[in-house]
Amino acid sequence: MIHCLADNIHSPFGNTTADNFAVLRRGAQRPTLHCLPGVPEPLCAALWPEGAIEARYAALYGAAEGLSRFEQLALLSIRAALAQTELDVSAPDCLLLLSTTKANVRWLAAAPESFVPRTGTLGETAAVIARHAGFSTVPVVVSNACISGAHALLLAARLLRQKAYRHVVVCGVDEQSPFIAAGFQSFRALSLAPCRPFDAARDGLNLGEAAATLVLSSAAPRRTVETPRAALDWCLVSGAVRNDANHISGPSRTGEGAFRALRATLPPDVSRLAFVSAHGTATPYNDEMESRALSRAALSALPVAAYKGLFGHTMGAAGVLETLLSFRAVEAGCVPPVQGFAQLGVTCPVSVSAVERPTHRRELVKMLSGFGGCNAALHFAPAPDVADAPRGFIERNWTPVAEVRLTSATCSVDGEILPLSATGEALLAAIYAEFIGGYPKFHKMDPLSRLGFVASELLLAAVRRKGHCLDENTAVVLVGHSGSQAADTRFQHTIADPDNYYPSPAVFVYTLPNIATGEIAIRNGFHGETAYFALPAFEANRVRHLVCTAGTDPETTALVGGWIECPTADRFEAHLHCYLPQAPSLRP
């Protein structure tokens, strides 16, 4: 079993999970209007007062030692959760998983040209946090848009089931900045009033910032006198990630990926579920999509909880924060109120209420969806109600059947070097024109997505030449270091000058590194798992291990993935493989 040992939420509404849940039940607070420096329009959001995070960190731990605001926030939550345990996180069987979408992206504003500080990349940021928290193992970043937190919990469970680690600390964290606010405003996705999930009058989301930490373990928790009497021994029973294969920024009209994730995750007896914790962004299309997915999964009558009417969209923190609030709700015997809801405004009926409802049931499902077409679902239940055998998990060996190596100067497929007519920034376009073609969307992609697209096209062509046919259950997993750094720098240029302020949604959407996986899924009709992970540095064995974690999903039929790094348009490398499950050996 995968047990949840300890947890914490740091948000503008409280510094413990209990405090935040109490605010949620009271329903007296909502996001408020804020003006961010350099952003012409105000935004309604759940944000800390200026300097509050730094002041709390200094009061508890002294000098911040050059840590960014983002890093201090993550450490506040991680240390608060670990203080509830007796774990020695310096042990080799402990791992930190950091779930975030943009991490230290605000640091780009100080140097929007070619220089990015040491904490400007995902991998380096995680290394700094892990070192200050006391970990000796190398951390992993999950940066998979809005589902990052849920995907990090699923990855943690898989690593624990594989016995790669004994304890995994998952911290979901994001802060708001002019970069993020400008991007969402460019999509016209923000409401100027407190948001209204699933309501007929909903007109957009609110942004929020938070850090939420959950300590998972293959060992059962030790109850102490400080353990709340109502606390349950929560276990992550099953989970899945599926792609819409539809659009990089718009949800599927049929809720395809969300439905597939639910179908792979739901328990055999859904009558045991207290409620489903929905993504509930309060945008017209997302809430409509979720209602369709719930209807297709025959869950229209199941109570729905949605938390963004209070906390806003906390992005990389959302999956962990909303899971923890759901734990507390089940322990309190209630379905939390959906703040901002008044009248149902989605096509397919779902059970949403603005008032708290009682429940005696003890299991729950968490849903999330995000840019890049990704969707996640997780099923949690208390330990006494969980069978020892995990659902949705299988151990298999995976064999590489094709390989592509691509840098800004060379390209090889299965060891055979391709003749190239260009190098540097012009190389990807040249390979596309000479060997691929026929896909105009290529020309609008950012450098990272172009690199992933070209490398995957060459790889899949080699796979087909060998007689293999990949189906829709193929997973795509990319691992890098600096994420979408090239796109981040480009978008920062569009908002740096107040007199020449022109944030573009077509540029902003590519500031999420998992978009590269979405482009590959859309091109090939892959509905399997898609993910982007980051490491502080390249390690071949770890990259392969992370890619193959998607192969523990019983529905995965093939894996496409590997290392991909593109800090600038003219400096890049990709080393991808296609893996197929190894046929079991026949016994004599």
Residue ranges and their predicted role:
Residues 174:
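Glycine-/small-residue-rich beta->alpha transition segments that form the dinucleotide
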Residues 1-139, 158, 177, 183-206, ...:
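Conserved "HGTGT" condensation-loop signature of ketosynthase/thiolase-family condensing enzymes
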Residues 149:
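Short conserved active-site loop signatures built around small residues
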Residues 153, 157:
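Short, conserved alpha-helix that lines the donor NDP-sugar binding/gating region
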Residues 164-166:
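Alpha-to-beta junction loops
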Residues 141-143:
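Compositionally biased, intrinsically disordered linkers/stalks adjacent to structured regions
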